[in-house]
A protein has these predicted regions:
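A contiguous, low-structure linker/loop signature
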Residues: 67-107, 123, 130
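Short, glycine/acidic-enriched capping/hinge loops at junctions between secondary-structure elements
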Residues: 31-35, 74-75
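Active-site loop segments of alpha/beta catalytic cores
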Residues: 1-28, 36, 107-250
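Surface-exposed strand-loop-strand hairpins of Gram-negative outer-membrane beta-barrel proteins
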Residues: 34-45
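A structural signal for well-ordered alpha-helical segments within the folded catalytic domains
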Residues: 44, 48, 115-118
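Short, glycine/charge-rich beta-strand/loop segments that flank catalytic centers
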Residues: 64-73, 136-144
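Aromatic- and acidic-residue-enriched segments that line the glycan-binding/catalytic groove
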Residues: 39-40, 74-88, 143-157
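Catalytic domains of carbohydrate-active enzymes, especially glycoside hydrolases
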Residues: 45-66, 181-189, 245-246
Length: 250
């Protein structure tokens, strides 16, 4: 295992070989023979599963938690927990009203599952360090988080209701930045903004709505001295240039 090699590669440095990061989410539960619904709500199980995944796959880095519903749940979205998958978001409070109109504020360390995640990080970080494995913190990106808050309406709102879309995505960006700060405090070596649904929009739309609302999070990672990354899913070739301009290390 080679934590520094992964950090170097993420920062654009040449390495002797490609580092290896298995994105083990609910697979961590499988490795320790637990149901995913229990796993994602128990600090001891999370720590055990993350350590097991790092050891089993000889990982150079491993996510502390691969669950993009954490921030949404922490501000009031209701989740559906599953035995064999990550939780899904069931309710979307901003379907018809902006976060300001609803009086939604910033989550704290005691909101939602954040206490569980902080506890799991404290338990597993020393084990990962001993294995020379980087701990990755994954913060839900602005557009994906906005889709949790407002539902699929957000994808038409970026064209037809721009003022509404800006209000929701700006709020999501602030939540993302606070999430990043939490992961930095936990000691994550690499912190990524994970915005999978951003691949569904045009580069021009990304620049208008996503780019400005990632900057606080990216700056928070860099201010901490941590390594930053931006994750996208699907066919993201059209977005490569604009994602790079957001300013992550990798």
């Amino acid at each position: 295992m080679a934590k520094q090699m992964l950090i170097d590669a993420t920062r654009g440095k040449r390495t002797d070989k490609a580092p290896w990061v298995p994105y083990a989410g609910c697979n961590g539960a499988y490795l320790i023979k637990e149901k995913a619904d229990r796993y994602f709500q128990d600090a001891d199980l999370l720590a055990k599963g993350v350590a097991a995944a790092a050891k089993t796959y000889h990982a150079d880095g491993i996510p502390l938690l691969f669950d993009l519903s954490v921030e949404a749940e922490a501000v009031g979205c209701k989740l559906e927990y599953w035995e064999d998958n990550v939780p899904s978001v069931r309710t979307h409070p901003c379907e018809t009203e902006t976060p300001e109109e609803l009086g939604l504020g910033m989550f704290t360390k005691s909101s939602g599952r954040w206490p569980i995640i902080f506890e799991a990080a404290a338990k597993v970080k020393p084990q990962l360090d001993e294995m020379d494995c980087a701990m990755l913190g994954l913060a839900t990106g602005p557009l994906t988080l906005a889709s949790h808050l407002a539902g699929v309406r957000i994808f038409t709102a970026v064209k037809k209701k721009k003022e509404f879309a800006h209000a929701v995505i700006e709020y999501a960006g602030r939540l993302c930045a606070e999430s990043v700060r939490f992961y930095a405090e936990m000691g994550c070596d690499i912190i990524a903004i994970v915005d999978p649904v951003a691949s569904q929009i045009r580069p021009e739309t990304f620049q208008e709505f996503v780019t400005p609302n990632c900057l606080e999070a990216v700056n928070a990672i860099h201010d901490d001295g941590s390594t930053s990354s931006f994750f996208n899913c699907g066919d993201c070739t059209k977005l490569i240039d604009v994602v790079c301009r957001v300013g992550p290390h990798g």
